[in-house]
UniProtKB/Swiss-Prot annotation:
It catalyses: Na(+)(in) + 2 H(+)(out) = Na(+)(out) + 2 H(+)(in). It comes from Vibrio alginolyticus. Belongs to the NhaA Na(+)/H(+) (TC 2.A.33) antiporter family. The keyword Signal does not apply. It is a multi-pass membrane protein. It comes from the Bacteria. Keywords: Antiport, Cell inner membrane, Cell membrane, Ion transport, Membrane, Sodium, Sodium transport, Transmembrane, Transmembrane helix, Transport. The chain crosses the membrane at residues 14-34, 47-67, 87-107, 117-137, 146-166, 171-191, 205-225, 252-272, 280-300, 321-341, 356-376. It is found in: Cell inner membrane. This is Na(+)/H(+) antiporter NhaA. GO terms for molecular function: sodium:proton antiporter activity.
Length: 383
């Protein structure tokens, strides 16, 4: 396993632990006498946007920039480079997004407001999933880790497309025009083989602001910037893409994602009823994550292998695939992010119950996925 992937697993596993701590602290504060202060700080305006807005639209754009970098690297020289290696996790990812969405729709088809949250259980939290699998150390085959990484990256890319197509507000033509021009400039820099990162960051900042004002979610600017960064440097230079990827990892894993979790997982349980907690919305999300994810990933994976379209990675069997598919039911940060887009400005009550459904489904998936991996993997570490 090359250094990039090894460093990635190491970073994300530690980051996953921080996510749990940040979420637990947020829940504790939100349900303590400091709850009002917590909400007040998040809704304090700084430079025209609330602190919460800066975190969700600003800092999360950096997270999506990292996703863009990772996807591009995997497409050009990693697990997604060839059809043979990409087809299996790609098919699994499609099933893993389709089945949870269908389960959610089945539960909420009769509620015109709740139905907009259909994409919430379709997401996988890559930091949490990799954090859990890292707890099992060298017992986990490298090929299984690469499968999970590729699946999660394709899943993230699917979420990006969903946000762009289904969670976009009223559009500003002028802002969109500026955004398209800046996108063109970014790829022109790439075509001209500009390897210095500063020009990309300056143009990228303008792109982010334009997208923010356009009605399209600002985080998508991060993905565009990531795809524009060149993989290869000039002769004798390091890869600009890999350099930026390594530079961003600690800030994203140890800063941005835990901060996002802290800002979004603080759910006040005041006024939450058992009838509300067991209503169609949170149940649709929890079961979408806990049942839909493994059902979709495992079924599509099994069918792809049986039909001869793809083959299992070396050293991996269907017990491992099922365990990983359960682990992919950890939606957490990505699901909360989509919930904020679906319900944040429409129904705070729906958003609260959606987040509780996410926490229920994700926590159960994490525990069950770990247990299944623990019992299905070899007792001794892989050589």
């Amino acid at each position: 396993m090359n250094d990039v992937i090894r460093d990635f697993f190491k970073m994300e596993s530690a980051g996953g632990i921080l996510l749990v701590i940040a979420a637990a602290i947020a829940m504790t504060i939100a349900n303590s006498p400091l709850g009002e202060t917590y909400q007040s700080v998040l809704h304090t305006y700084v430079f025209g946007m609330s602190v919460s807005h800066w975190i969700n639209d600003g800092l999360m754009a950096v997270f999506f920039l990292l996703i863009g970098l990772e996807v591009k690297r995997e497409l050009l020289e990693g697990a997604l480079k060839s059809k043979e290696t990409a087809i299996f996790p790609a098919i699994a990812a499609v099933g893993g997004m389709l089945a949870p969405a269908l389960i959610y729709v089945a539960f909420n088809a009769n509620d015109p407001e709740a139905i907009s949250g259909w994409a919430i259980p379709a997401a996988t939290d890559i930091a949490f999933a990799l954090g859990i699998i890292a707890l099992l150390g060298k017992r986990v085959p490298v090929s299984l880790k690469v499968f999970l990484l590729a699946l999660a990256i394709i899943d993230d890319l699917g979420v990006v497309v969903i946000i762009a197509l289904f969670y976009t507000g009223d559009l500003s033509t002028m802002a969109l025009l500026v955004g398209f021009i800046m996108t063109g400039v970014l790829f022109m820099l790439n075509a001209k083989e500009v390897t210095k990162l500063t020009p990309y960051m300056i143009v990228g900042a303008i792109l982010w602001f334009a997208v923010l004002k356009s009605g399209v979610h600002a985080t998508l600017a991060g993905v565009v910037i990531g795809f524009a960064i060149p993989l290869k440097g000039k002769q004798g230079e390091h890869s600009p893409l890999k350099h930026m990827e390594h530079a961003l990892h600690p800030y994203v894993a140890f800063g941005i994602l835990p901060l996002f979790a802290f800002a979004n997982a603080g759910i006040s349980l005041e006024g939450v009823s058992m009838s509300g907690l067991t209503s169609m919305l949170p149940l649709g999300i929890a079961l979408g994550l806990l049942v839909g994810k493994p059902l979709g990933i495992f079924t599509f994976s099994w069918a792809a292998v049986k039909m001869g379209v793809a083959k299992l990675p070396e050293g991996v069997n269907f017990k491992h695939i099922f365990a990983v598919s359960v682990l992919c039911g950890i939606g957490f940060t990505m699901s909360i992010f989509i919930s904020s887009l679906a319900f944040g400005n429409v129904s705070p009550e729906f958003d609260t119950y959606a987040r509780l459904g996410i926490l229920m489904g994700s926590t159960t998936a994490a525990l069950l996925g770990y247990a299944l991996l623990h019992f299905s993997l070899p007792k001794k570490a892989q050589a």
